[in-house]
Amino acid sequence: MELLALRWVLLAGTLLSTSAASSALQEGDLGSITVIMDMAPNSFDDQYVGCAHVMWANLQKLKCTEFARNYAYAVGWRKAAAEWQKRWGYLAHPMQLRPEQAIALLAYSAASNLYQQFNAATRQGGCSHQYYVHFYHFKTLHFLLTQALFALRASQPRCYYVYRGVRGIRFMTQRGKSVRFGQFTSTSLRKDVAVNFGQDTFFVVKTCYGVPIKQFSFYPSEDEVLIPPFEVFEVTNFCTGNGRIQIYLRSKGKMSRHNCELLKPRGGQWGRGHQEVGLGLSPGLALPVLPCSNCSCWGSGHRAGDPIPAAV
């Protein structure tokens, strides 16, 4: 495949005007901002249906190109590759994931600014084909994380009840609304872990496309479950009280506006149109409702807005 030219450098701060800052806010930040949840229409949500083999064939060259243009990505990958070598480099038997997939998960979960840059870019990377081609410098990381989650889910397809805590951001929505995170979103199987990341907004989520990545995380004690950007959720409850928000989400299926986006210039045989998959409600038990202390539950909201930055 003839690789597309990557010609311009993404200007610092471009995404900040349209997306929320990371929930890992530093001490001393003043107050909380308000962000409205929606279907994240600008998200880059490719599932690479029918073209994964082509992406794999060109992965190394594209990855080197992105490393040259993205210092944080190159450094994060190098650190993750060293960790992979330490954990599994001398195993005689094959792993559940390819080395590149495992390294991608390690790089995402590391304590660095890579995941923040990646999530901010992913929330806006699908606003147009040209924007994706020229400004989205995480094409390989997105592909590898997507493939890793597919591979892990294939071995144990089930739903999980998870939690997500956010500090410094109050998310607004309404009961019955369909929403997406629009990025790879970290959650935890443990409520106490999620609480430590913040309670300005606290999510209780039933995910059927997110998968546990404990084995491939820099911080296995966090019991992380990683949710892909294309999973759709129904808001089953929205509570507010004592300056805090609680949002309950139930998996509704998955939806992508992009497919094989990188290959579109080669004749348009891939990635045409608006792809929707499995928008029926996922089977299983109803989402458990936890008590909201001194809060009211809303059934209405205001307007649509940005998806959620990584908190865990």
Swiss-Prot record:
The keyword Signal applies. GO terms for molecular function: NAD+ poly-ADP-ribosyltransferase activity; NAD+-protein-arginine ADP-ribosyltransferase activity; nucleotidyltransferase activity. It holds the Pfam family ART. Residues 1-20 form the signal peptide. InterPro entries: ADP-ribosyltransferase_ARG, ART. Disulfide bonds join C51-C260, C159-C208. This is NAD(P)(+)--arginine ADP-ribosyltransferase 2.
